[in-house]
Structure formats: structure tokens, C-alpha cells
Amino acid sequence: MSVFTIVTHEQLSAWLRNYSIGKLVNLQGISSGIENTNYFVTTSHGKYVLTLFEKLTSAELPYYLNLMAYLARHGLPCPSPVADLANKFLGELNGKPASIVTCLPGKSQESPTATHCAEVGELLANMHLSGLSYPEKMENLRGPRWWKAAAQEVMPFLSEDEAAILGEELRFQSSHRTESLPRGVIHADLFRDNVLFKDGAMGGVIDFYFACNDVLLYDLAITANDWCLNENAELDPERTLSLLEAYHRTRPLLEIERDAWPVMLRAGALRFWLSRLQDYHLPRAGELTHVKDPAHFMRILQSHAAARSKLAEVWI
């Protein structure tokens, strides 16, 4: 979440006349994150989050907004999009598609314990099961086809060693097939900053704008790559097992998923290494932006590649 498009108090006050959520009291830009423009919005009725979408189009956005509304109706602790007076979730503000959603309580947990990882595992499994009946479909816009295109864009900026690592990983991933793995709706970005805790309990999960239909295990791998790492970019066995076991109790994992686990961990690291390389070397203009270190995910990828047999041992 960043601020690429400026919204003034007067502009938002006028825009909010299309909604029944009271008068604007306060507007505050959110600098964390990297994809969209986000503001905390306080009105006379409560607190909300305003998002102006910088990349996603009006044709793509109903999938994400309807998904949040669907999951909230099914008991998942996620933001609920607010409909305007015309009963639409999506509007336009300052030339960008825009929506406003409820603001969930809590803060992210930067130093998660095994207990936190277990809560996240259960949450993710419940989301996957609930999503099986979600009728809309969206391909993964950050999937293998995008990996190849993004790699071509960033390759001129890489050192010889970095380019070799990237090329080898693309070859490795292209040699593995995922068609037989369970699929459904995935969050695809369940990092620590997208899960909120309040007074030791989970407050909810946010930022569904990378959600798509893809391999469920890939979602679990992305989550493990952020929640379960130690300072050496290796999976911590205790936290990883807590995540996997809690997930498995709700959606039992298959033997074929165990076999694919090391591949999916590397795929998750590759995807975020590439997106961070893009953001670092090809930045977009913005007033409050947050660019993250791409080398972090290169280290994770290297660690996973060097420990494939060890990764397979950490399983339920």
C-alpha cells in the first residue's frame, strides 16, 4: 500500500456523497505496500480504507471486490466492500478505479510465534475451502507467463551471478507441472503485514488484490516464505510445522502436495523476487512509496534451491 495518486480532503468529501457512511473527518495516506494508492478514512460513521487502483482495471476489479464480500459473508475475517448509493462496490476517483472497504482492527505481527503461524494456517485453509464455491474466475496475473516477461525487463539490471540464478530458476520451474495439484481461490500475498492481530487474537486478513485461481499449495508456500523464516532465510521447523499442521486439520494435504512442496516454495520466492526487482529497478512515481529489498527473496530462493531434500522433511 502506497500513495501514488493524491486525494485531497475536498475531493474525497465530494466523492463520499455517493455513499451512506457519513461525513469525512480525517484522511491519512498509507505508505506501506507497493501496488495501489491507499488511505485510512475516518467518517462520522466509522473507519474505512480507500483504495485507488494503479494497475488493475475496472474490468478486473469485480473479481476481487466480490470475493471479499463473498468471504466476509462466509465468516472469514476480511474487509467488506462498501456499496455506493447505486449498489456498486467500484467507483472512480481522480481518474482511477476506486473502492472503500471496512477497516479491520489490529496490527501486523512482525515476530510471529508458532501459535501465530497455526492461526494463519487455519485461516488460510478456511479461505481455500470457502473459495471452492466462489463462482468467478481469475488467472494468476503474476504466474509463469508473467515471470518470463518480468525476467526480461529486469535482466539488464542484474549482475552476472544474479542473472544466472534467475535463468536457472526459470528453467527449473518450467520443468515441473502443477496441473494435478488441488486448485482454487488463493490469496497469493498472505505476508505478515496482511494479517492483523488485536490483543493476541486474529483481527483479520487484508489486501486481496493479488487473489486469483491457482494451486492451493502455492498459497501455503508464499505464506511460509514470510511467516516461517529464520535469520538465515531458512524455514524454521517449529513454525513451519505449526502452519502446515493447522492447515492440514482443516484441509487435509495430499501426498502429491508433499512431493511438490519444495518446488512451490521456490516458485513463491521467484515470484516475489521478480516483483521486487521490478519495483526497485523500474519504480513508479508516487508521493509516499515503499520499495522493498529484492535481495531478500533471492536469498530465500538460493536457500530453498540448496536444501530441497531438507525442505521435504519438514511436513505433516
From Swiss-Prot:
GO biological process, one term: threonine biosynthetic process
EC number: 2.7.1.39
Coiled-coil stretches: none
One Pfam family from the record: APH
Biochemical pathway: Amino-acid biosynthesis; L-threonine biosynthesis; L-threonine from L-aspartate: step 4/5
Keyword Kinase: yes
GO-annotated molecular function: ATP binding; homoserine kinase activity
Catalysis performed (reactions): L-homoserine + ATP = O-phospho-L-homoserine + ADP + H(+)
Class of enzymatic activity (EC top level): transferase
Keyword Nucleotide-binding part of the UniProt annotation: yes
Keywords assigned: Amino-acid biosynthesis, ATP-binding, Kinase, Nucleotide-binding, Threonine biosynthesis, Transferase
PANTHER family listed in its UniProt record: AMINOGLYCOSIDE PHOSPHOTRANSFERASE DOMAIN-CONTAINING PROTEIN, AMINOGLYCOSIDE PHOSPHOTRANSFERASE DOMAIN-CONTAINING PROTEIN-RELATED
Assigned protein family: Belongs to the pseudomonas-type ThrB family.
Protein name per UniProt: Homoserine kinase
Gene for this chain: thrB
